[in-house]
């Protein structure tokens, strides 16, 4: 028999009844029932119940065992007594009567329990991550992650892609975040950079004559962490294709991502035909370029209903040409309590408030409060915008300060445009859309969640297309790239030479899923003269382009094929499919929010000898 096991702890069934077996694993839990010890023995594959009674030679050793001790047991497989079976356990029909027990590795007192789902502080969990990873849910997440990556590889190969590995030590490049720098011992004063993405290398692969590349690529960015972004490093499904247009990329990628989601969605519906949503439309309808399409709410421009109205705040705003008023419909949100709650939320977000209109059914009010209630409601609904002698018939009317100020005709026009009914409400944001769009998107999300309008049991995928190539940087007071500087501008060199830079769109696209950006890519700018012009508009001269992107720029001079690609965030996809909201729940050994590895003690001071070899002298710290 093998030194440690003949079977795993998830393998035994009624087929092995009567056999002598050997198992090794962790003591998941130990219970004493009337002097008989029951040990739940756990390994990577499952859990088996082990029984040790006082007649067993193993009993004396078993009495010493505590939670998370590693033990080996020999024993005989038998059926569990009738009525004690556990149908939720793969081995739940049998148990092992132990005849021999060996302690392979005792455990100190546990700083956090492995059994159960008790929440513990993140610092404790990360410092003792090896214990945390033994917990069932996290252990399962990590296994799911590996299976998802396997599925990605298999599906990419099925689409004709070939896997390559690009260098980890490379040159610094402006990918939008700070680099992690690695000092060179052999070249004093010079540094390598860890790749923020394999962007230049994958384009060089296309210029080297290969046709379809992919890899599960580690990426390193020195940026501030957040829940959906791990500090330090992350992984992406990186790909590139030659001789393609945008739709060719979509046709290759869509079945891979859809297939992976269907395989691991546990029966939840997955979008079959992905919509293509232009960037500007996504902002206008959803307030974000990564919309959660499970939320049915669509924002609309209702400026005309407030222009010249009795609500002077909005009316004066609309005298400025660029300003608009947007409405966020709230079906079923027509209660004062809900509207006040949303108003308080808006103030907590740093806004002065959130204007609203509620719609009520006057006929229902009449039944409840009589004729006087109807007259009072009618009088209030007339408002300053109604005009003398205006008569409102009983029916659905607007209520609230905005409705009182703009009058029933405008209020009814808003209701009709938004397709709302009695018991519904709408919230309003006004001003420069460029400045309020982010808040409007947050408000749409908040309304959808508060009113339980979001179907949590499905995955909605969409392409976001037609991103602006440039944006104006208020901080630097200049035009800069809005996304990937290597993307092809729509209209090519001619657009760069003749159009207002802020009007140029790029062959740039993202994949949005349930409110997250899970992939981004573009058709590449493969003509050197167009590349130089694109960077010139953003403030980089030709010499800078040659210095910073020398390898790729040189390759462009020797016959570069039209090409494009994208990168999908492995971590975010796994996070969504595992049903968690924090990336640390799907990563083996993550850092904390301060970018500290509490388990390994990184970052740490380097030894003086190491620093001397690298020709580095730490600067004195300011006091």
UniProtKB/Swiss-Prot annotation:
Which GO biological-process labels does this protein carry?
aspartyl-tRNA aminoacylation
GO CC terms for this protein? cytoplasm
Q: Which domain of life is it from?
A: Bacteria
Task: Tell me the NCBIfam families matching this sequence.
Answer: aspS_bact, PRK00476.1
List the residue(s) that the UniProt entry marks as the site Important for tRNA non-discrimination: 33, 83
In its keyword annotation, does this UniProt entry include Zinc? no
Catalytic reactions on record: tRNA(Asx) + L-aspartate + ATP = L-aspartyl-tRNA(Asx) + AMP + diphosphate
Statement: the UniProt record of this protein carries the keyword Glycosyltransferase: no
Per UniProt, subcellular location reads as: Cytoplasm
Q: Which residues bind ATP?
A: 221-223, 517, 569-572
Where is region (Aspartate) located?
199-202
Q: Name one GO molecular function term.
A: aspartate-tRNA ligase activity
Q: Would you identify the family this protein belongs to, as annotated?
A: Belongs to the class-II aminoacyl-tRNA synthetase family. Type 1 subfamily.
Subunit and partners: Homodimer.
User: Per UniProt, which keywords does this protein have?
Assistant: Aminoacyl-tRNA synthetase, ATP-binding, Cytoplasm, Ligase, Nucleotide-binding, Protein biosynthesis
Q: What is its main location?
A: cytoplasm
Q: Entry's Pfam families?
A: tRNA-synt_2, tRNA_anti-codon
Q: Which residues bind L-aspartate?
A: 175, 221, 483, 524
For this protein, the Enzyme Commission number is 6.1.1.23
This molecule's function is given as:
Aspartyl-tRNA synthetase with relaxed tRNA specificity since it is able to aspartylate not only its cognate tRNA(Asp) but also tRNA(Asn). Reaction proceeds in two steps: L-aspartate is first activated by ATP to form Asp-AMP and then transferred to the acceptor end of tRNA(Asp/Asn).
Q: What is this protein called?
A: Aspartate--tRNA(Asp/Asn) ligase
């Amino acid at each position: 028999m093998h030194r440690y096991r003949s079977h795993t702890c998830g393998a035994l069934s009624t087929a092995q009844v009567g056999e002598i077996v050997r198992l090794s694993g962790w003591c998941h839990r130990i219970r004493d029932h009337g002097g008989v010890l029951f040990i739940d023995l756990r390994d990577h594959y499952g859990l088996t119940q082990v029984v040790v009674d006082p007649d067993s030679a193993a009993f004396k050793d078993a009495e010493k065992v505590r939670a998370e001790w590693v033990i080996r047991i020999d024993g005989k497989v038998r059926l569990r007594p009738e009525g004690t079976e556990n149908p939720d356990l793969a081995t739940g029909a049998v148990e092992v009567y132990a005849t021999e027990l060996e302690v392979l590795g005792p455990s100190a007192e546990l700083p956090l329990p492995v059994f159960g789902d008790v929440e513990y502080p993140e610092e404790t969990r990360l410092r003792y991550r090896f214990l945390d990873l033994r917990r069932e849910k996290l252990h399962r997440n990590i296994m799911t992650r590996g299976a998802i990556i396997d599925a990605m590889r298999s599906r990419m190969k099925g689409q004709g892609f070939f896997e390559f590995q690009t260098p980890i030590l490379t040159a610094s490049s402006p990918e939008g975040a700070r680099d992690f720098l690695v000092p060179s011992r052999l070249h004093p004063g010079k540094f390598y950079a860890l790749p923020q993405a394999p962007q230049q290398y994958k384009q060089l692969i296309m210029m080297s004559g290969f046709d379809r590349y992919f890899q599960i690529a580690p990426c390193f960015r020195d940026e501030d962490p957040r829940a959906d972004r791990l500090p330090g490093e992350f992984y992406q499904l990186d790909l590139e294709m030659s001789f393609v247009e945008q739709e060719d990329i979509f046709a290759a990628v869509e079945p891979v991502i859809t297939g992976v989601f269907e395989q691991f969605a546990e029966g939840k519906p997955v979008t079959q035909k992905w919509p293509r949503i232009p960037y500007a439309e996504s902002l206008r309808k959803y307030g974000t370029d990564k919309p959660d399409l499970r939320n049915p709410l669509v924002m609309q421009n209702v400026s005309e209903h407030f222009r010249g109205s009795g609500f002077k705040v909005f009316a004066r705003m609309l005298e400025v040409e660029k300003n608009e008023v947007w409405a966020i419909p709230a079906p079923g949100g027509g209660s004062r309590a809900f509207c006040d709650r949303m108003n308080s939320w808006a103030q907590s977000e740093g806004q002065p408030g959130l204007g609203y209109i509620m719609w009520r059914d006057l006929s229902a009010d009449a039944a409840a409060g009589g004729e006087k209630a109807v007259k009072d409601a009618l009088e209030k609904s007339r408002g300053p915008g109604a005009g003398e002698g205006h008569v409102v018939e009983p029916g659905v009317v607007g209520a609230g300060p905005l409705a009182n100020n703009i009058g029933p005709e405008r209020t009814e026009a808003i209701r009709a445009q938004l397709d709302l009914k009695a018991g519904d409400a709408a919230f309003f944001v006004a001003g420069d859309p460029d400045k309020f769009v982010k808040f409007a998107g947050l408000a749409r999300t908040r309304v959808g969640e508060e009113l339980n309008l979001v179907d949590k049991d499905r995955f909605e995928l969409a392409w976001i297309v037609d991103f602006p190539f440039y944006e104006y940087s208020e901080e630097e007071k200049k035009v800069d790239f809005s996304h990937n500087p290597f993307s092809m501008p729509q209209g090519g060199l001619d657009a760069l030479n003749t159009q207002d830079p802020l009007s140029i769109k790029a062959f740039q696209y993202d994949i949005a899923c349930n409110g997250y950006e899970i992939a981004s890519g573009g058709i590449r700018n493969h003509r050197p003269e167009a590349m130089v012009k694109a960077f010139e508009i953003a403030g980089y001269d030709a010499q800078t382009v040659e210095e910073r992107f020398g390898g790729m720029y040189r390759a462009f001079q020797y016959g570069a094929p039209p090409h494009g690609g994208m990168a999908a965030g492995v971590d975010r996809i796994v996070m969504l499919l595992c049903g968690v909201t924090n990336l640390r729940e799907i990563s083996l050994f993550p850092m904390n929010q301060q970018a500290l590895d509490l388990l390994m003690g990184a970052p740490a001071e380097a030894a003086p000898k190491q620093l001397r070899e690298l020709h580095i002298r730490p600067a004195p710290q300011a006091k």
